[in-house]
Amino acid sequence: MGCFFSKRRKADKESRPENEEERPKQYSWDQREKVDPKDYMFSGLKDETVGRLPGTVAGQQFLIQDCENCNIYIFDHSATVTIDDCTNCIIFLGPVKGSVFFRNCRDCKCTLACQQFRVRDCRKLEVFLCCATQPIIESSSNIKFGCFQWYYPELAFQFKDAGLSIFNNTWSNIHDFTPVSGELNWSLLPEDAVVQDYVPIPTTEELKAVRVSTEANRSIVPISRGQRQKSSDESCLVVLFAGDYTIANARKLIDEMVGKGFFLVQTKEVSMKAEDAQRVFREKAPDFLPLLNKGPVIALEFNGDGAVEVCQLIVNEIFNGTKMFVSESKETASGDVDSFYNFADIQMGI
């Protein structure tokens, strides 16, 4: 048998024309579309307005460096974004699956959403932020933060493509690696700060094609008060369970409560186990245990005098038939909030 196969191969070689070369093997990685790094960077620009439209970055890494007095808009999701040595720039970044890292930047105004946010060796940044984990600053000063506030039609899908939840936003819970005694290197922007005064909608013909809105009630990310001092000693916790209309119901409830003068303090989307539910929901836990397997829950904290009573009325009138956890009374509500968010912070490693 060995001789037979040997002769067969020899015959094949002899029958092949002399000028016919053997084709190289094709591998799947050879067939991938080649990526030109220049398509995913802005470098050395001055006094320009530039950007990328939805679908043009598609999850790639992006680099912005050595830009001065530029307006930069990335209307797409990306893997990571590094911003180095930029001065007096306006920057918008669509959802970033990983980290956004500012280094040695000055006098920049930004709106962005990401999994991780880090600033090092920077001065005077104003950032409207959605960040899933605790933002970190290092060797930096005069960094100001506000809550992400932005809309365009493709943005919700880009959040999903980047693996980010619009309800996981720790924009105001800042960690300073290098605090200075007696000084504060960061602060919160005024609550009435208008995002368009900092990061205006682009006006160039190409970028105007993206239908942007900065109206608060259209923002993809719910606008929360975060670490600001609460206006009342009464809060109310609402927990919505996974289903076809959970996000829509959460948005509707936020609109109703904010419309009646209450404040949205914080939001969270996280998976719960039975033992977690027992600690948070206590005697009501058995009612919700069957719902935990459907997916993560969404929690909302509202604040204001009468928040518990009004929230109960809205849930009963508008969402009758949809199971939700709502704090029972003003007296128990603060414990509900603490129990849930302590659990959520541990779960998410914050």
Curated annotation (Swiss-Prot):
What family name appears in the similarity comment? Belongs to the TBCC family.
The way this protein sits in the membrane is described as: Lipid-anchor
Subunit structure, interactors included: Found in a complex with ARL3, RP2 and UNC119 (or UNC119B); RP2 induces hydrolysis of GTP ARL3 in the complex, leading to the release of UNC119 (or UNC119B). Interacts with ARL3; interaction is direct and stimulated with the activated GTP-bound form of ARL3.
What's the chief localization of this chain?
A: membrane
User: What is this protein identified as?
Assistant: Protein XRP2
**GO CC term, one of those recorded:** extracellular exosome
Q: Which gene specifies this protein's sequence?
A: RP2
Q: Which residues bind GTP?
A: G98, S99, Q115, Q116, F117, R118
* Basic residues compositional bias, start-end: 1-10
Q: What is the effect of changing C3S?
A: Targeting to internal membranes. Loss of targeting to the plasma membrane
Name the PROSITE patterns on file.
C_CAP_COFACTOR_C (PS51329), NDPK_LIKE (PS51374)
Q: Does the keyword tRNA-binding apply?
A: no
| Keywords assigned by UniProt, alphabetized | Cell membrane, Cell projection, Cilium, Disease variant, GTP-binding, GTPase activation, Lipoprotein, Membrane, Myristate, Nucleotide-binding, Palmitate, Protein transport, Retinitis pigmentosa, Transport
Task: Spell out the subcellular localization from the entry.
Answer: Cell membrane; Cell projection, Cilium
Keyword Lipoprotein appears in the UniProt entry: yes
Lipid group attachment sites (S-palmitoyl cysteine)? C3
Looking at the record, which disorder is this protein connected with? Retinitis pigmentosa 2: A retinal dystrophy belonging to the group of pigmentary retinopathies. Retinitis pigmentosa is characterized by retinal pigment deposits visible on fundus examination and primary loss of rod photoreceptor cells followed by secondary loss of cone photoreceptors. Patients typically have night vision blindness and loss of midperipheral visual field. As their condition progresses, they lose their far peripheral visual field and eventually central vision as well.
Q: Where is the C-CAP/cofactor C-like domain?
A: 24-179
Entry comment describing in which tissues the protein is expressed: Ubiquitous. Expressed in the rod and cone photoreceptors, extending from the tips of the outer segment (OS) through the inner segment (IS) and outer nuclear layer (ONL) and into the synaptic terminals of the outer plexiform layer (ONL). Also detected in the bipolar, horizontal and amacrine cells in the inner nuclear layer (INL), extending to the inner plexiform layer (IPL) and though the ganglion cell layer (GCL) and into the nerve fiber layer (NFL) (at protein level).
Cite the InterPro entries for this sequence: C-CAP_CF_C-like, CAP/MinC_C, CAP_C_sf, CARP_motif, NDK-like_dom_sf, Tubulin-bd_cofactor_C_dom, XRP2
Lipid attachment of type N-myristoyl glycine occurs at which residues?
A: G2
Phenotype when changing S28A: Reduces affinity for mouse ARL3
Q: Kindly provide the PTM information from the record.
A: Myristoylated on Gly-2; which may be required for membrane targeting. Palmitoylated on Cys-3; which may be required for plasma membrane targeting. Mutation of Cys-3 targets the protein to internal membranes.
Q: Name one GO molecular function term.
A: unfolded protein binding
State a single Pfam family of this protein: TBCC
- Ranges of Basic and acidic residues compositional bias? 11-31
- Note down the stretches annotated as region Disordered: 1-31
